[in-house]
Design a protein with these regions (language model features):
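Secretory-pathway lumenal glyco-enzymes, predominantly type II signal-anchor Golgi glycosyltransferases
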Residues: 2-467
Length: 467
């Protein structure tokens, strides 16, 4: 009986087993595929990240200030540098910052350029890179490039350009996106070695619009830019308010009285003159003074009205003094000058997380960087460094492990150097929509890789007084 049941049910069991095996294999394959997809997009990696907090460390692990200070004073540090960019300069212009006419420069512009971008460099020379944009503000523009392997024709063309314009520095590293940190630090090294006589240094990609005028305005008063430029309008509005609200009733005095009393106004008291102009236009007193009045009556009226006039002048003079004091207080903002030892690292500041999906151009593995956040950093399309910040960050970089993304690397260096990146909205890391009148306070805008577009926009803004 049992044997009979087995024979009858065996085909059913075999069919069920085969079906279950197929279903099980299907789900196993689906699960494996899902795991691979999640891993590709970094889902599991995020769970393994270390929290970025006050205990953050990045090689070299430890305080580096003492070592940096030793290097800056040409002394041997207790710990040797762990990261130096020892590349050879194929094209050098070490005399670029030596000029008998200028002992120092206000700004040196360092343009990170690709070797083949000849037209972009030419457009920059003819716009914001023109070194005599303002005759009373000495500046220099320097292009930094790498090399292309086995492209002798391109190299020869670059050498001709360098010989003609004498504004190109070339080092023997491969010019590619993932070597931007090398390009940046080669620039730092060259500046520290050959061009320390500038108060500020601006690093810019060769596809950026730059307003030289706004750069100079910004470095004059970074904390209040661009608001402090709007103050004169406020002062002007205040003047008009005083003029309208404090105008008293007409005194009714004719010109003869003012001439008789020989009232003299200071040339600078334009506000008094303006307010008195309306006050001294009526001839009401002529209606009051008839020929029947005797000299005593006339003298009495003259004294009364003269006293009233003098009080008016006194009141208006007080307004002028108040306005002058107000303007002087405002002018202190305009004339603000950063101290020589300020450590300014300014641009558009970001706080973001590493890209963990492997398809990303900016993918970073846990072995490269294990934390869930980057240190605060500045997008490196355009940023400004004071001389002190440049020196401090250059020597600190020698104790910072190399990282292939230059903006992140400089963020790591700044954190080690205890330099807080300074944020300004007018450094546009994207291409700001252009209209004729919305670039008034723009310092930089990305997306101007077309030389003709840069020329057109920059020249239009220059004509408006914004570039």
């Amino acid at each position: 009986m049992c044997l009979l049941m087995y024979c009858l049910l065996r085909p059913c069991f075999q069919t069920s087993f085969r079906l279950a095996s197929k279903i099980k294999l299907k789900y196993v394959c689906i699960c494996i595929g899902l795991i691979m997809i999640l891993d590709f997009f970094g889902a599991f990696t995020h769970f393994l990240e270390i929290t970025y907090d006050s205990k953050f460390v990045y090689p070299y692990e430890g305080d580096v200030h003492e070592f940096v200070n030793a290097l800056r004073h040409n002394e041997k540090p207790d710990v040797d540098p762990i990261n130096e960019y020892n590349y050879t300069y194929k094209i050098d212009i070490r005399q670029k910052c030596e000029d008998a006419a200028y002992s120092s420069f206000r700004v040196v512009y360092i343009v990170k350029s690709a070797l083949e971008h000849f037209e972009r460099r030419m457009a920059i020379r003819n716009t914001w890179g023109f070194e005599k944009r303002f005759f009373d503000v000495p500046s220099r523009t320097i292009f930094v490039v790498g090399v292309h392997q086995e492209d002798n024709e391109l190299q020869a063309k670059l050498e001709m350009e360098a010989a003609k314009y004498k504004d190109i520095v070339q080092a023997d590293f491969r010019d590619m996106y993932y070597n931007n940190t090398i390009k940046t630090m080669i620039s730092f090294k060259w500046l520290v070695k050959y061009c320390q006589n500038s108060k500020f240094y601006m690093f810019v990609d060769d596809d950026m619009y730059v307003s030289v005028r706004n750069v100079l305005r910004f470095i004059r008063n970074p904390a209040n830019y661009p608001d402090y430029l709007k103050e004169p309008k406020k002062i002007g509005a205040h003047k008009r308010e005083i003029k309208d609200s404090d105008k008293t009733e007409e005194l009714g005095i004719n010109n003869s009285i003012t001439q008789t009393n020989s009232i003299t106004l200071n040339k600078n008291d334009s506000l008094v003159r303006e307010n008195l102009k309306d006050t001294l236009t009526t001839n009401e007193i002529n209606h009051k003074l008839t020929q029947d009045f005797n000299n005593e009556t006339l003298n009495s009226i003259t004294v009364i009205n003269t006293n009233s006039l003098m009080k008016k002048i006194s009141d208006q003079a007080e307004i002028v003094r108040n306005e002058t004091n107000l303007q002087r207080r405002k002018k202190q903002i305009f004339d603000f000058e950063l101290p020589e030892d300020v450590r300014l690292f300014a641009g558009f500041v970001f706080v973001s997380s590493p890209h963990r999906h492997k398809s990303s151009k900016w993918y970073v593995s846990l072995s490269e960087y294990p934390y869930h956040l980057w240190p605060t950093y500045i997008t490196t399309g355009a940023y400004i460094l004071s001389k002190e910040a440049l020196l401090e960050m250059y020597y600190t970089s020698m104790y910072t492990k190399h990282f292939r993304f230059d903006d992140i690397f400089l963020g790591l260096v700044a954190k080690k150097a205890d330099i807080e990146p300074f944020h300004c909205e007018e450094f546009h890391f994207y291409k700001k929509d252009y209209t004729k009148f919305n670039y008034k306070y723009v310092i930089t805008s990305h997306g101007y890789g077309n030389p003709n577009e840069l020329l057109n926009v920059w020249n239009e803004q220059k004509a408006l007084g914004n570039a």
